Amino acid sequence: MLRKLLFGGVTWLALCALAPDQAVAQRIASSDSLAVAAAVAAATQQYVQQAQPESVLFNGPEYVNRNPPSTIGHQYFGSADPQLGTITYRNAQFRGILLSYDLALDQVVMTYPSQAVTVQLVPEKIGGFSLGNHQFVRLLADSVAKSQAPTGFYEVLLAGPVSLLARHTKRVQQTTVQQNLRLEFRQTDQLFVRTASTMAPVDNLKDVLNLLPTHKAEVQRYARQQQLRFSGAQREASFSSALRYYASLPQ
């Protein structure tokens, strides 16, 4: 009997001792759950606020695609569908935004999630944007002395003191096939080299060498040794390789 009482007492004391710990653990778990829920709610609210019609992003005219449905291809960069991207707009950065880049109009378009609402963002308010791994900046024609580049958006292919950029455009080409008018989007990609003093289009190695202030012979020799090809599919990679080598030389 004594053994039973002692055992029962120990058991009861143990339960009493554990009860506060379990209560504390429950309170901690509940607190953690509330913290996680609050964080998720805050993140969701932040995105919704960024993408709501009254947001700073919805501060431009409605975008309307006026191209005939029969036109072959599309006018956008990469994909005809909106892509998740990041944009710097009115000195604020917005992530995870549905964006399209109309190459025919040189216009960035935002799509409101789950709604058929598209807005043209004001170009002058855009500092830059990204679509996937592609980074774009907006440059003014007079932002660089002796610039031969028009105002607009440029893809940054290589950043640095001497940078390589691409100006992508699309135009509708009209042809007649068996007495029927054929409309098709065609893309043009013009490369530019930007230095501290100028920005100009480049089509071959000679164009690049004319823009470099120093090390022209070294870059020319490197291009010959590496068998760089400044045309066709290897064009962008070859220009980037030559400029990376130039940047590695003592200035």
Residue map of PLM features:
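General N-terminal leader/first-domain-start detector
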Residues: 2-3, 11, 23-93
